[in-house]
Amino acid sequence: MPVKEENASSQSLSQAIEDYLKAIYTLAGDQKAASTSAIAKRLKVSSAAVTAMLKRMSEAGLVRYQRRRGVMLTKVGTVLALETIRRHRLLESFFTDHLAMDWHQAHVEAETLEHFISRELEKLIDSKLGHPMSDPHGHPIPSAKGVVSKEALKPLTDLAAGTSAVVRRVSDEDAEHMRWWKKIGLVPGSPIRVREVGPFEGPLLIEIKGKSHHVGRKAVEGIWVASDGKRKKAVKPRKAAAKAGKR
């Protein structure tokens, strides 16, 4: 029936808008502008589709959009973005903690269901989980009032040789990376030490739970850490290579 088609179309548009709001906030927060190209890449859509949607969202008062200057969320847009992000991260936490889903599967399911759960179900999930502050990847879960906790973090790739740190956050954008990180123990809460930094943007030699791993920068650029303030003597390149060879 026409009415059902209209409702389905409206619902689909609402979901798309929530996806855009979430993408803009993730890329730029509520203080900076996100580029249309970055949004297109993140959502896997064309730049033309992004431009058309941003114009519609601007007319609805959700974003401030100027061509070639990017897009920023309005106060209303920020509130809606944080509500969607909260539902997504609560769902991910529930799926991993209570249904034993792996990170990627939980992320995919949350991408769909975040648009449909009621506020009452959201509250029940939050209560069941014990009101968590972060999701399985270490990303902060906005409070019901839209408050987001912040922590001074730096990319793992910025650490100098001999520096110890604690993993706080991992990107949820690449399934293969997530599986590999979890396999070697690069998960939120894990202490790590950078033993060696290769020259000219070379690979890193990191230590996790007593085991050493040579990792390329691209493979760990989605890892964010908090320094524990400890600085140990860096391992010399030749010695590190020799030890790695014995393993």
Give the positions of each predicted feature.
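A short, conserved structural fragment
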Residues: 58-66
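Basic, amphipathic "hinge/linker" alpha-helix immediately C-terminal to the N-terminal HTH DNA-binding motif
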Residues: 69-88
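Mid-protein regulatory/catalytic core that forms ligand/cofactor-binding pockets
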Residues: 114-222
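Extreme N-terminal segment that seeds HTH/winged-HTH DNA-binding domains in transcriptional regulators
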Residues: 1-44
